[in-house]
Amino acid sequence: MASELKKITDLSDEEKAQLFKEFEDQRVNYGLCFMDFENIMYEHKLDYQGKLRVSLPLGENLVLWSLLNEDAIRLINEYVVSHGLRYKPTDTDMYAERGRVLDLPVISSKDEAKIMKNAKDLKKPHWLPVELVSIDENK
């Protein structure tokens, strides 16, 4: 018998704090990408899957991740803001090792200024693989 998935909006403050702790432990010890968010939410039997994309405001065709629901995106955004994080371009290996890559053309440049400058010119969706790092982190 399949167990019911828990809605993210039904998380208690303690459950959300535990999730954020797991996100942060993953980030500090191994690096954190969108696939890690999915894996942790899956382990907690949360309803996170959907049809939405995470994109940057600079260009809707600059896709960071896809197939999430609105509640999952809100949870991730809350974690990112509350922990003072930013998205940093990475390679696809980080995602492949964790179980999924997007079936989109990949932006492989790590030059953030160039990526942001060209984002609005993308005519079709392109995937920008990212990891989360501290705003102060310069690695």
What are these regions (language model features)?
Residues 33-40, 79:
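A short acidic, leucine-rich amphipathic alpha-helix
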Residues 2-7, 11, 47, 71, ...:
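Eukaryotic, polar/proline-rich low-complexity intrinsically disordered regions
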Residues 81, 94-139:
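Short, amphipathic alpha-helical interaction segments positioned at domain boundaries
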Residues 19-22, 40, 75:
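Charge-rich, solvent-exposed alpha-helical interaction surfaces
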Residues 6-35:
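Positively charged, polyanion-binding regions of nucleic-acid-associated proteins
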Residues 43-70:
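Short, positively charged loop/turn segments that connect secondary-structure elements
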Residues 39, 52, 101-104:
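Intrinsically disordered, low-complexity regulatory/linker segments
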Residues 63-81, 87-90:
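Short amphipathic alpha-helical interaction segments
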